[in-house]
């Protein structure tokens, strides 16, 4: 994490419960059943068996949620956030892909690598826990700078791109794409982490980052391309990119391209 309000990377009162039975897709609409075709790719991938240093293997909940967020991006290539996340590699002082020395050739490949890096970022920033708030030992309680959610982002990051405040406003009124059931899974959270700090829109940002992990993920995708310096583990390159996880996202993209009807089901979630 980066700055005074970041959470410790591992120790917490939150626990990802082990091996719970798989639940059906998070909507009673029977037409959404085939979203399991997307999440099953993640759950059965080599990425699901790949350890990220001391953080271990990614939990089922994060794999399912990130699979659906990535699928949404693939289904909406002209959306503002997808275009930024998949744009050509830029300046290494701002762009995480350039900072890592990566040069994916196509927009598809750049999007896959960004989501793979986000998986490594979540490992370091929150141990893949959606509900992480500010470090309880930190004295700073400003709504502008207190970090929240999977990727420990703070509201003062919004100046990185005009797309970010627009994304925030969109998700405030439309929770489709949160994929909260998938991301949250069996994770339980302490009151200390669920608390939001300060006043104004920064409090709403903290709350939305926790309660709507899909928002936090799309926001982080833009941040990685526009202001990677916000994140200490990215700056230090301790957030890892695992080839098995990049391949997992590629396999999801290929599945969607072979079955475009999945995009219609995603749009209802």
Task: Describe these PLM feature segments.
Residues 9-24:
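Short, low-complexity, disordered segments immediately C-terminal to signal peptides
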């Amino acid at each position: 994490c980066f700055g005074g309000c970041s959470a410790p990377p591992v120790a917490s009162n939150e626990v990802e419960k082990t091996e719970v039975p798989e639940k059906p897709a998070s909507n009673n609409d029977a037409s959404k059943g085939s979203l399991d075709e997307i999440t099953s790719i993640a759950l059965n991938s080599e990425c699901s068996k790949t350890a990220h240093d001391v953080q271990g293997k990614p939990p089922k909940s994060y794999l399912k949620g990130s699979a659906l967020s990535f699928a949404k991006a693939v289904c909406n290539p002209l959306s503002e956030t997808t275009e930024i996340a998949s744009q050509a590699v830029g300046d290494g002082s701002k762009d995480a892909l350039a900072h890592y020395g990566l040069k994916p050739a196509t927009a598809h490949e750049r999007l896959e690598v960004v989501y793979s890096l986000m998986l490594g970022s979540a490992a370091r920033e929150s141990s893949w826990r959606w509900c992480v708030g500010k470090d309880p030992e930190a004295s700073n309680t400003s709504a502008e700078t207190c970090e929240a959610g999977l990727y420990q982002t703070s509201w003062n990051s919004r100046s990185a791109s005009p797309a970010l405040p627009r994304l925030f406003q969109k998700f405030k009124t439309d929770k489709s794409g949160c994929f909260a059931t998938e991301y949250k899974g069996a994770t339980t959270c302490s009151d200390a982490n669920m608390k939001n700090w300060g006043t104004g829109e920064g409090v709403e940002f903290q709350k939305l980052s926790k309660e709507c992990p899909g928002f936090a993920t799309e926001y982080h995708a833009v941040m990685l391309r526009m202001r990677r310096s916000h994140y200490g583990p990215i700056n230090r390159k301790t957030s890892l990119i695992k080839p098995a996880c990049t391949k997992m996202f590629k396999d999801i993209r290929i599945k969607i391209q072979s079955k475009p009807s999945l995009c219609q089901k995603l749009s209802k979630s």
